[in-house]
């Protein structure tokens, strides 16, 4: 089920404060560490660099593409590592 049209996009207050501070100081190259994977990428985040926590590490996310706006930060930092499907077990045993 999608989000209602009348609701504004969600952005955690701490993330909003960090983005506003980075834009005010002009520190575009500084990496902003965030834990809020549910926050939506807004147009004022364009050109900033984030480090999104996936539960273990901080994954670097650079918001440099116009197509990223409207997506959530969690979409760009995977939480699971794909190890691959089973292959030839005889070859791995040698």
From Swiss-Prot:
Q: Name one Pfam family in it.
A: Ribosomal_S19
Q: Which domain of life is it from?
A: Bacteria
Which key words tag this protein in UniProt? Ribonucleoprotein, Ribosomal protein, RNA-binding, rRNA-binding
Q: Which Gene3D superfamilies match?
A: 30s Ribosomal Protein S19, Chain A
Can you list the GO cellular component terms from the UniProt entry?
cytoplasm; small ribosomal subunit
**Which GO molecular function annotation, any one, does this entry have?**
structural constituent of ribosome
InterPro entries in the cross-refs: Ribosomal_uS19, Ribosomal_uS19_bac-type, Ribosomal_uS19_SF
**GO-annotated biological processes:** ribosomal small subunit assembly; translation
* Keyword hit for Ribosomal protein: yes
What does the record give as the function of this protein?
Answer: Protein S19 forms a complex with S13 that binds strongly to the 16S ribosomal RNA.
**Which family is this protein grouped under?**
Belongs to the universal ribosomal protein uS19 family.
Q: Which NCBIfam families match?
A: rpsS_bact
The protein in question is named Small ribosomal subunit protein uS19
From which lineage does this chain's organism come?
Bacteria, Pseudomonadati, Pseudomonadota, Alphaproteobacteria, Rickettsiales
